[in-house]
Amino acid sequence: MTVKTRFAPSPTGYLHIGGVRTALFSWAFARHHKGEFLLRIEDTDLARSTAESVNIILDGMKWVGLDYDNADNVVYQTRRFDRYKEVIAELLAKGDAYYCYCSKEELEAMREKAEKEGTATYDRRWRPEAGKTLPEIPAGVQPVVRFKTPLDGVTKWTDLVKGEISIPNEALDDLIIARADGTPTYNFCAVVDDYDMGVTHIIRGDDHVNNTPKQINILKAIGANLPEYGHLPMILNEQGKKISKRSGDTVAITDFGAMGILPEAMLNYLARLGWAHGDDEFFTTEQFIEWFDLKDVSPSPSRMDLKKLYWINGEHIKITPDGKLTELVKPRLALRDIHETEKPALEDVLALVKDRAQDLNALADECLYFYKKQVPAEADVAKHWDDEAAARMLRFAERLEGLEDWNAKAIHDLFKPFCDEEGIKMGKLGMPLRLAVCGTAKTPSVDAVLALISKEKVLKRIRA
């Protein structure tokens, strides 16, 4: 059997971080088992679904690196209405579905009664049964189509995350599978799609647990083999509440890219939200695919931790090849009015500073002083700069100017003799030198920094 999983987002807005985590686990499961990962766009909500939102989903999937095996044949539900109508007609013909002519007022009264009695919402008054007389069909009413849910027994499955789940059928409504205007409903479309796509494992959020028994019963009615189900726990924000844009949480996957997060780091972090491989916190995408197993997914909600995300991102920055990192940082430097034609070469700068930042924006800022002296912080000036330091910098500039070979070793070899002559420790030279040349007291090894900036620029900055 070829494992087939799917990700089925609705194009009604941004691509939510929770949705991406669901897609990631579904993708990793398929890749681990050498199977197929499929994309389906659930766009039956015609009022809210937009082409722009579809593009946001596709762009988000591309950014985060989740490739899907039906890229040339992505399933769009709005293109499959004829197929849904065909299956509905089959269910009606077999007696597994029926027309319901209830008015909104009747349904509201049933809902209120059901809330008081703790029963299923719909009283099945239009459900055909042997020996039952149905109401007279009202004039001018367009009916909905309901699925004929089994009344006896239970619907149960072994959830790949939550374990055994059993729902009494008497607790289930006769689900509406087609609205009065003829359009099919979500639960029905999803079932037909999963059947036609050959999906073997449905991995999704645990907000779909209540949909599962309804969908299982429909699958049985159309004669389908049942897939296996795994329902993933919710992701909470740092306060332990549901992630919400209204609460100020970052929820759209593209926002994390703007924050300077690498897609590899995002996948690494999302993988750890609910799944574990021993004590491993940092790993590559290839390792994740090799290690992934749904039995290692916790059924309990996980909580966002942005500090950990940034730490993981910093670790991924360190192992990113300098050439690739250059292409990622280059546009961020352009926004800071630093362009690729300027010296020193950005790739050389990044090789020196890449372990000093936890996101690409901070990394771009870390590069700035190689191209333009920055305005030093008042606290650094107060601590490391005075008239004596200024005079000492001018004396050291004379030593630098005398160097024939401009490289880190040659610059480093000047430090000890100069400090001995001045009767100072290295800190009294290094910190003011950083301020004079870079505008900050926090840099990598000062000899390496000066070597990259160039002799001409270093002397000009010191003597400015």
From Swiss-Prot:
Where this protein primarily resides, as one coarse class? cytoplasm
Query: What keywords are annotated for this sequence in UniProt?
Result: Aminoacyl-tRNA synthetase, ATP-binding, Cytoplasm, Ligase, Nucleotide-binding, Protein biosynthesis
User: What stretch of residues is annotated with the motif 'HIGH' region?
Assistant: 9-19
- Its domain of life reads Bacteria
One GO MF term, please? ATP binding
GO cellular-component terms in the record?
cytosol
**Which catalysed reactions does the entry list for this protein?**
tRNA(Glu) + L-glutamate + ATP = L-glutamyl-tRNA(Glu) + AMP + diphosphate
Segments passing through the bilayer:
none
Q: Supply the InterPro entries for this chain.
A: aa-tRNA-synth_I_cd-bd, aa-tRNA-synth_I_codon-bd_sub2, aa-tRNA-synth_I_CS, aa_tRNA-synth_I_cd-bd_sf, Glu-tRNA-ligase_bac/mito, Glu/Gln-tRNA-synth, Glu/Gln-tRNA-synth_Ib_cat-dom, GluQ/Sye
Query: What positions carry the motif 'KMSKS' region?
Result: 242-246
- Binding residues for ATP, per the UniProt record? K245
Work out whether the entry's keyword set contains Ligase. Answer: yes
User: Is Coiled coil one of the keywords UniProt gives this record?
Assistant: no
Its Enzyme Commission number(s) read 6.1.1.17
Matching entries from Pfam families are given as: Anticodon_2, tRNA-synt_1c
Subunit structure, interactors included:
Monomer.
Q: Which HAMAP family match?
A: Glu_tRNA_synth_type1 (MF_00022)
Q: What does this protein do?
A: Catalyzes the attachment of glutamate to tRNA(Glu) in a two-step reaction: glutamate is first activated by ATP to form Glu-AMP and then transferred to the acceptor end of tRNA(Glu).
Q: Which family does it belong to?
A: Belongs to the class-I aminoacyl-tRNA synthetase family. Glutamate--tRNA ligase type 1 subfamily.
Q: What is the designated name of this protein?
A: Glutamate--tRNA ligase
This chain's source organism reads: Neisseria gonorrhoeae (strain ATCC 700825 / FA 1090)
Q: Top-down, what is the taxonomic lineage of the species of origin? A: Bacteria, Pseudomonadati, Pseudomonadota, Betaproteobacteria, Neisseriales
- Gene that this polypeptide is encoded by: gltX
